[in-house]
Amino acid sequence: MISPKDFLRKNLKMIHGYPIIYTFANNWENIEQFHSRPDDIIIATYPKSGTTWVSEIVDMVLNNGDVEKCKRDFITVKVPMLEMAVPGLRTSGIEQLEKNPSPRLVKTHLPIALLPKSFWENNCKMIYLARNAKDVAVSYYHFDLMNNLEPAPGPWEEYLERFMTGNVAYGSWFNHVKSWWKKKEEHPILFLYYEDMKENPKREVQKIARFLEKNLNDEVLDKIIHHTSFEMMKDNPLVNYTHLPSTVMDHSKSSFMRKGIAGDWKNYFTVAQNEKFDVIYKKEMSGTTLQFRTEI
């Protein structure tokens, strides 16, 4: 019998040079050999970049803004996470995906190098949502306080150092966003920014609809924007992850959906931390055309 202590708060495991959550890494062979379908739609992000938000938007776009249809099940069932595997506790992402009808929505945080080859071979459409690194670091820290599948984050100062060096689950934010940005030159990838979606959700939802070849009128777009607002989603038990056991996600430590704003990093970074981060950021992001806004 598997006990939670066998997989909770374990150190990350290296998979092909990338640090991956312990229980996910133990299921690696199944992930690597995953069989995609040509009409699969992949929703990819670095953790804490608005994954659940964009997942619910995509589901609503595909269902023409039908709120009742979108209430059919939990987000973890509608948009399974490819690499999710928690032994004895819940259906794995792959098991859920095998049950889901086409077109399937597939969530992942995997870096380009670890994504199953099948997705490239089938030329699957992909949506990548990127968020500025400073807000990601703060959000990821709070997430790791409550997500017991991750190693304990320790103090914020130490966590930020690990984040800057890529010593967190899924590795370096810098490498993640840069590699997905580059890949869009040769593959159908819609690359979106969290800050743009916050600033002008209608424009960004229209981009998603066009990418998925859906023609939605203003009324439907407005309904989608209302239903997927941070306030609505934070209180929606189908998407706010309160349905997961508290042994896995302890909402008393921090809520899954915490603030959902751009610029919260300013409440956490010291002047010295910010200066050091900026130096590393400039070095890591030199040579890329990627541009991020740290506030809007």
From Swiss-Prot:
E.C. number: 2.8.2.1
Q: Which GO terms describe its molecular function?
A: aryl sulfotransferase activity
Annotated tissue distribution: Expressed highly in the colon, kidney and small intestine of male and female dogs. Highly expressed in the jejunum and ileum of the male dog than the female dog, which displayed more expression in duodenum (at protein level).
Compartment annotation: Cytoplasm
Q: Which GO terms describe its biological process?
A: 3'-phosphoadenosine 5'-phosphosulfate metabolic process; epithelial cell differentiation; ethanol catabolic process; flavonoid metabolic process; sulfation; thyroid hormone metabolic process; xenobiotic metabolic process
Identify which top EC class this enzyme belongs to: transferase
Transport found in the keyword field: no
- One Gene Ontology cellular component annotation held by this UniProt entry: cytoplasm
Reactions this protein catalyses: a phenol + 3'-phosphoadenylyl sulfate = an aryl sulfate + adenosine 3',5'-bisphosphate + H(+); 3,3',5-triiodo-L-thyronine + 3'-phosphoadenylyl sulfate = 3,3',5-triiodo-L-thyronine sulfate + adenosine 3',5'-bisphosphate + H(+); 3,3',5'-triiodo-L-thyronine + 3'-phosphoadenylyl sulfate = 3,3',5'-triiodo-L-thyronine sulfate + adenosine 3',5'-bisphosphate + H(+); 3,3'-diiodo-L-thyronine + 3'-phosphoadenylyl sulfate = 3,3'-diiodo-L-thyronine sulfate + adenosine 3',5'-bisphosphate + H(+)
Q: Provide the alphabetized UniProt keywords.
A: Cytoplasm, Transferase
Residue ranges of the TM segments: none
Q: Any other noteworthy remark?
A: Contrary to other mammalian orthologs the canine SULT1B1 does not shown sulfotransferase activity toward dopamine.
Give the similarity note: Belongs to the sulfotransferase 1 family.
**PANTHER family given for it?**
SULFOTRANSFERASE SULT
Q: What is this protein called?
A: Sulfotransferase 1B1
What organism does the record attribute this protein to?
Canis lupus familiaris
